[in-house]
């Protein structure tokens, strides 16, 4: 048997490169989570999941590691502190958490609590998010930045919050918005604290590049900024402008794009200062990316820079432009939500079954009587028996041609169902035999490099792709997926992952691999009576809130976990996933009404002797249990 180590597994899943030293594999072959990159302590994911199941918490389970979240906040702030010290930057840096990344109360609560030491702020983009921001700022003095479109009610709420004493900045996204703010300021007699969003010509890269540039959805053009300054001056509100904001997109993959935006944005700041606008803050927005695939490249699922390089470039570029222009260096704000939240959340679920040929007839005995088979099938038998490394190309090409021929002959009525089934069986056996030979050949013949895709098996996972990792479906985002056990054993299956929705789009066919993107995920054959779990990593940003209820699969169970030196871990919070009745409620159905309707019908059927009392009672009991139960699959 070929020797296999946990280092081999770490390599094929590229774990060291995307894991940010927060994930590792222990001697048991299980994935572990660390509270910080330098910590020797860890939590065994498989052991944790087993313990949760004993507590009747069923998969799929969303695990939120709050120490990891704190560590990411600390890492970003530490990088900026170092950059400020190294560059002798005379002003400050401040992190703002964009609530849209993950609005869950416990998440925002943890960020607000831990972020106190860094004077962390909250960025909001809607009225509901504004209410959340005010809630957390009450009694805590947390600063708030308001982005996005705003109506009269929104603006008036911000104005009165400002008067009461909240530190709240309202960012002007469009000229018509500024006119509303000025009118309401006059009406209420309350002076706002204003920011102006600048529409830069610089653009980001990757999936969100259109967030920047001349055609961006938000921001004022340069001519509009001049008009805004004039309008504010006329209304004696120019001194209310304390901030400028720009944003060229989420997940910026190239550091040079960030530098270009910083240079252009800081020039705007410098020119506005020269025009007499007392700006104190430059909000550089989001864009600090996450290396999802570990390639450290400019590919859309990666970034070609580190947090430290990002922070250093921000500080250096802004200082350099300000000194050149002869203006004061501003306080710097960033809204790095993705980089803050992505790593702390892991979805773990069980694999249910596979589309393998385990239950197919075994035609092994038939091989001895091949002369009685149809010619096409007989040729496949001959290839299977004689194949070796010297005839690989020819045998592979012949196999492809013969299986196509078998399908055509079956459609024309010249092959029986059993003969076509045997042809399929032989096709799989031949490909696996070829694969066994190919793995030992270097270099692999070019035409055989992609044939392994034919061997890919579909593993069905107990989750909804649309609910738990919607970006995988919507924008083809890569997320690392790794089995959380048996990593001291060599995987023996090349797989895709399908969810349990009734939708063909509910399948993942692109994965993070050793050399970047790959079309299959190495997994193990599932043993009889074995619980086999996979983890979906780096899903803490956007996925929960973007998830939808396709097939009415609801929120998963969620567990907040912190590290504990004595016991290994501590469960802080358990949030139950949606029961069936809760999912139905989202679409205006009421569980009690459904039960009553069915019960009334059952009583009529009992009276007409269509069903027995026992059958009716048992059916209603099953229906009631289903309404109260988890939307995902059990045994």
UniProtKB/Swiss-Prot annotation:
The modification N6-(pyridoxal phosphate)lysine is found at residue 100. Substrate binds at residues 282-292. It catalyses: L-arginine + H(+) = agmatine + CO2. InterPro entries: Ala_racemase/Decarboxylase_C, Arg_decarb_HB, Arg_decarbox_C, Arg_decrbxlase, De-COase2_CS, De-COase2_N, De-COase2_pyr-phos_BS, Orn/DAP/Arg_de-COase. GO terms for molecular function: arginine decarboxylase activity; metal ion binding. Its EC number is 4.1.1.19. Keywords: Decarboxylase, Lyase, Magnesium, Metal-binding, Polyamine biosynthesis, Pyridoxal phosphate, Spermidine biosynthesis. This is Biosynthetic arginine decarboxylase. It comes from Geobacter metallireducens (strain ATCC 53774 / DSM 7210 / GS-15).
